[in-house]
Amino acid sequence: MNTTRRVVLGAALAGATMLATRVPASAQSGPIKVGILHSLSGTMAISETTLKDVMLMLIEEQNKKGGVLGRKLEPVVVDPASNWPLFAEKARELIAKEKVAATFGCWTSVSRKSVLPVFKELNSILFYPVQYEGEESERNVFYTGAAPNQQAIPAVDYLAKEEKVQRWVLAGTDYVYPRTTNKILEAYLLAKGVAKEDILINYTPFGHSDWQTIVSDIKKFGSAGKKTAVVSTINGDANVPFYKELGNQGIKATDIPVVAFSVGEEELAGIDTKPLVGHLAAWNYFQSIKTPANDAFIKQWKAFKKNEKAVTNDPMEAHVIGFAMWVKAVEKAGTTDPDKVIDALPGIEAPNLTGGVSKMLPNHHSTKPVFIGEIKDDGQFDVVWKTEGLVPGDAWSKELDGSKDLIGDWVEKKCGNFNVKTNKCGGA
């Protein structure tokens, strides 16, 4: 090869090498896409639309600070329309087509279960912001809502101790979260010495509207001379006619209190709260809690919505915490690469809105305070009980035989269902 040709070829190769290295660099300098996977229509829109909006607000705020790694964030919003198989399709669209770095989404456990195989197959990250049944610790999911030991179990303990409840109605929507939560609660109550005949379990479909017979059964069950309470895992817009029927049949909170796990400020906004006054909800956040951080968040939210009546709620705060943790993890990793961000997240801390600091744990759950709130006539809550500190989320319930020896640990064990007795991953 002559010298001239060698020089030309060398220059061409050098140019090609520079071009090859430039392409990823230019891709790295573009916006970072963030997926938002919440139902904007259908039965769950009453709860999920707000979560889409709070993510848009958080992304807008982060962009004002310069984005992440010097890159702007670009929200990608889809509507899975309360259709569980559609959640999986929309998740695939976000990850494979839109190339999002992470997704914030889902409310119901059936929607989360629907998307899990997609996030595992395509190796992407989901932040899930709603209380759920536990019995799960997935590498690709970070659970920023409550596990049963951060909501359901403390609520039952409160009712037994403070309200002297002896008979229990476990009422839920017919899907995995209420069924598993009630299985845990039934085992817990039986272990506490509650008789099986003092536990009534009932399930209704999504969007259920005719509560007359069920509420009549609850009233009858509560007339046996023992203090009775309803533990409600009823989800979505079915809550409105349920509480209305309680009022229609003259059931007051002083007679049969209801403690709800899926009724918050958003669900109470714009409905007649008279039938609900005095009933309870268990959450890890309430709008009514006075802290400088919460006051600032409420003010920011009302300004963003251009609505002085806009309310805040627990899953919104879970997105606030989860988003802050994701930003910190990306900055710590120096990249949006999912494997590196997943490894960076355990140990990351972010302030919650009620005065503490939440920490992401090796089981991909976080530490949270627990509050019991009493519904007021303005749709807000009076906090009547709270934990002294933050409660670490348990992925696996000690109340269930198949789970009590399991832990999730993605740092040391690299396993979501490690059996501490057999020292084996896989739960066996």
Model-predicted segments: where are they?
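N-terminal secretory signal peptides and thylakoid transit peptides that target proteins
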Residues: 1-14
